[in-house]
A protein has these predicted regions:
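Amphipathic alpha-helical interaction segments
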Residues: 21, 42, 63, 96, ...
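C-terminal peripheral helix-coil segments that are non-catalytic and often amphipathic
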Residues: 1-6, 144-152, 163-214
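Amphipathic alpha-helical linker/stalk segments
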Residues: 70-97
Length: 214
């Protein structure tokens, strides 16, 4: 295990299966606990593996969070690519694309709430450069594609600066969804069901652009 990489990549299918079990178990535990509260012994016990198997793949507990981080962003980029193809965005209206994007973000943050809460806390409190680099890479992968598709419908946008409106409106929608899903449990008076959160976030973006709902 090199100094540069605290995660030992599995070389065999069995080793990959064990690693996936550890990551899946850790992600499930993080839905109920913070990363500081999570313990290696708890993870391996629930994963049905051993402490030795854990340290054979991860240098320490921090490496586990890094692996969860890397897996999330790999899935995020893959899922976004599939979304565009499956929903045929080349032939959809601007409002449909925005609603699809809001649903996608809500599903991503619902599916990985515990992991993303832990990653965001670590990035904020410890200035984790690796997380920030992967977050920027995911953003640079997603946003330009979305921007291009939305600006193909610039004639529908009545905001005086369509480019600015798309950039600002998307960030507004993205960060609103993230904050509600990661920290909403701390604000009992501001909780919404997932469908409402998705629909209202999309409607706010569409309204800001000055686009008529289609």
């Amino acid at each position: 295990m090199s100094k540069q990489n605290p995660i030992r990549e599995p070389q065999q299918a069995r080793s990959q299966k064990t690693m996936n079990q550890i990551l899946d178990t850790a992600a499930a535990i993080l839905e109920q606990k913070t990363f500081d509260q999570l313990t290696v012994s708890e993870v391996v016990h629930q994963a049905g593996t051993s402490v030795g198997a854990f340290y054979g793949r991860f240098r320490n507990k921090e490496a586990l969070l890094q692996a969860l981080d890397e897996r999330f962003f790999q899935r995020f980029e893959q899922d976004f690519e599939e979304l565009q193809l499956e929903l045929d965005w080349d032939n959809q209206t601007i409002t449909t694309i925005i609603h699809d994007t809001a649903k996608f973000l809500v599903e991503v943050y619902r599916r990985d709430t515990g992991v993303l809460r832990s990653l965001n806390l670590k990035a904020r409190l410890s200035d984790d450069s690796q997380f920030k680099a992967r977050e920027k890479n995911a953003w640079d992968t997603m946003y330009p594609q979305l921007q291009r598709r939305l600006l193909q419908h610039a004639a529908c946008i009545t905001h005086q600066d369509p480019g600015l409106a798309v950039r600002f409106g998307f960030r507004q929608m993205f960060f609103s969804i993230r904050e509600f899903l990661l920290w909403g449990s701390l604000r009992e008076n501001f909780r919404y069901d997932l469908e409402t959160l998705s629909n209202e976030s999309a409607r706010a973006f569409i309204s800001y652009l000055g686009v008529e709902e289609q």
